[in-house]
């Protein structure tokens, strides 16, 4: 941000240009920080999900089918990432004090939060897989595995919503267009378990009884 601001000030000595450059840099940092935190939380949850399922021999270690993981990662999560990109700048970003030099996204406390959040998601999915309705299968669609997949996918979207603002509630105005992409993530998860095409592709079953 300092280098960018320096280049701008050489050609434009208006103080407002410098302020705008700092504002832009802080907003870019916020988006990158939210993206990194979301991805590492999801990675933590998936790794713990697979590891615990293998250790406890839940459904022979098959917590989710590969296509379910790929759909959650490359379709559902992408909607949240796009939401980060198109979200309006944080209106209060210039009211906060500057970050300390050398501050990092991946601090020790933040790593602990990623692990705990991932464990909660993984534990919820595994509980449904182990004790949910119907016996899970390593080859065929089942209600319990579909519920586990739904927990993972919805948790990814909801975590993205929570991580939208660093020091503000996630529903702080203006909500759109960010909320529109979050809603698309919810809709894709619903479609994955309720439309026949995606049911066949992802080996899911309807959770509404339809």
Regions found by a protein language model. Name each.
Residues 3-168, 192:
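Membrane-embedded transport module
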Residues 16, 109, 177, 196-199:
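Generic alpha-helical secondary structure signal
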Residues 133-139, 197-207:
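Membrane-interface helix termini and inter-helical loops of multi-pass transporters
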Residues 171-180:
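Cytoplasmic-side transmembrane-helix entry/capping segments in multi-pass membrane proteins
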Residues 181-185:
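Alpha-helical transmembrane segments of multi-pass membrane proteins
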Residues 188-195:
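Structural signal for alpha-helical transmembrane segments and their membrane-water exit/capping regions
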């Amino acid at each position: 941000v300092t280098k960018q601001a320096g280049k701008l000030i050489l050609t434009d000595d208006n103080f407002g240009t410098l302020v705008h450059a700092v504002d832009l840099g802080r907003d870019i940092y916020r988006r990158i920080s939210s993206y990194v935190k979301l991805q590492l939380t999801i990675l933590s949850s998936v790794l713990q999900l697979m590891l615990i399922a293998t250790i406890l021999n839940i459904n022979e270690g098959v917590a989710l089918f590969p296509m379910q993981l790929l759909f959650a990662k490359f379709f559902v999560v992408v909607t949240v990432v796009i939401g980060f990109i198109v979200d309006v700048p944080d209106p209060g970003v210039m009211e906060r004090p500057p970050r300390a030099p050398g501050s990092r996204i991946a601090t020790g406390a933040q790593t602990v939060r990623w692990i705990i959040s991932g464990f909660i998601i993984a534990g919820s999915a595994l509980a449904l897989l182990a004790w949910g309705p119907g016996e899970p299968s390593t080859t065929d669609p089942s209600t319990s595995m579909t519920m586990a997949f739904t927990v993972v996918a919805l948790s990814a979207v909801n975590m993205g919503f929570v991580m939208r603002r660093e020091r503000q509630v996630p529903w702080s105005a203006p909500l759109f267009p960010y909320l529109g992409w979050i809603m698309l993530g919810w809709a894709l998860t619903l479609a994955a378990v309720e439309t026949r095409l995606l049911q066949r592709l992802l080996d899911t079953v309807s959770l509404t009884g339809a």
